[in-house]
Design a protein with these regions (language model features):
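Alpha-helical transmembrane bundles and membrane-interface segments of multipass inner-membrane proteins
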Residues: 1-174
Length: 174
């Protein structure tokens, strides 16, 4: 596939994912902002509206506005611009799985940055998973996009490490 087509498809995927994130967050604002809690599968999946000014598990909620601006908006934007430049430069060598992974990271990051810019530095969160008292923190699809890629990379590279160990174990020693 031609590099320009890969970049085009990457941009389409990232924009579609950002659009999906925006639509679902707006739906959560419209239907859950009044304090309504919706539960599915015996409380395994819960929808509950929250505004998070911090990061994962609300880390950084108490930061000053200026520090928050740098940590949650400016630095992530710089990272995402670097990521986009990397994809543009390396797209020729990338397969579609890597491109989709980078599109998920870009969409997840941009989804939350858009929230922070539009809604006075807070992100709309609305999903919780768990059984009984063992529950996740509250999150959104942008968080899920990035988390999916991180977990996939960890599993992929763990598998590669295991393969390398097997290959080196089968090599004759000198």
């Amino acid at each position: 596939m031609k590099p320009w087509l890969k970049i085009f498809l990457f941009c389409i995927a990232a924009c579609a994912l950002i659009g999906f994130d925006r639509i679902i967050k707006n739906f959560a604002k419209e239907h859950l902002m009044d304090g309504q809690i919706i539960s599915y599968f015996k409380n395994f999946f819960v929808l509950k509206y929250a505004e998070n000014t911090g990061a994962f598990f609300s880390l950084g909620n108490e930061l000053s506005d200026s520090v928050s601006l740098w940590i949650f908006i400016i630095v992530p934007i710089a990272f995402l611009i670097s990521l986009l430049m990397y994809v543009i430069v390396k797209s020729k060598e990338m397969n579609w799985i890597k491109l989709l992974g980078f599109a998920l990271i870009l969409a997840g990051g941009m989804g939350n940055i858009i929230d922070r810019i539009l809604y006075d530095r807070h992100v709309t969160d609305f999903m919780i998973l768990g059984i009984h008292n063992l529950r996740t923190g509250i999150f959104n699809f942008a968080d899920l996009f990035v988390s999916f890629v991180v977990v996939s990379l960890l599993l992929f590279y763990r598998g590669k490490k295991d393969e390398n160990l097997k290959v080196s174990e089968n090599q004759p020693t000198e």
